[in-house]
Amino acid sequence: ALELRPFTRFTIAKSLDDLTNNKLSELMNSIIRDRSTGCFMIGPKNITSKINDTFLVKLSTAIAHLIGVPNHDAMTGKYYARFQVKHEDSSDSYLRKAYRNMDLHTDGTYVKEVTDWLIMTKIDEQNVEGGETAMLHLDDWEHCDDLYEDPVGKQNFVWGSPKSKNIDYKVEHPVFSSDKEGRPTISYIDQFPEPQNMEQGNFLQRLSDGLEESKNKIVTKLPVGYSVIANNYFWLHGRK
């Protein structure tokens, strides 16, 4: 029903919130919109046979719809993306590659839809070493002021995507913008910008180096059944 009847996604969200007398939605929305936090993890105390992929899709759907309306995912053709990271992979991006870091980035850099926040859920894990989740808050980043104040970061960059994303257009937007209070926000991923000149190319290299060398990254093992929910304007995420 969740796949074919969109209104049931709100029904399941309300059912979850009703279990907490609407306190869950209030708490999650206060965290996700607060610049000093903007991110949280949620998961079960114990994994049982009932916490399977079907349950986790339902739970993630409910959480997402208590915060907003998810963007359509063109890669999978659904209201959510689901993929496997495998031992062998021949795809055209880092997303499914087990033995490559996925550098710090934000989501939605190459689509027209606005991406305010994201939810990532680990449904299953077998025969795995490493693969930790990496996170970085923009206000904790040592190089933020330097790069934010560089005028190149405010230029429009061209952003494309590989064929697997099923997006047949390109977009233009700057790497850095600001919120209503004038604080930095970022929209960036290393794989998809198409620099138009030396100035933009060198700026992106400085940006990439500065993010990956940050001493303030949070690197944590995300257990099976757990989700990370993050504000997409000032939290970057990756995989190590």
Please describe what each predicted stretch is.
Residues 49-97, 101-103, 120:
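Long, hydrophobic, well-ordered secondary-structure blocks that form the structural core
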Residues 1-69, 222, 227:
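N-terminal auxiliary "cap/dimerization" subdomain that precedes the catalytic jelly-roll/cupin core
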Residues 1-19, 34-36, 82-224, 229, ...:
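Active-site environment of non-heme Fe oxygenases that use a 2-His-1-carboxylate facial triad
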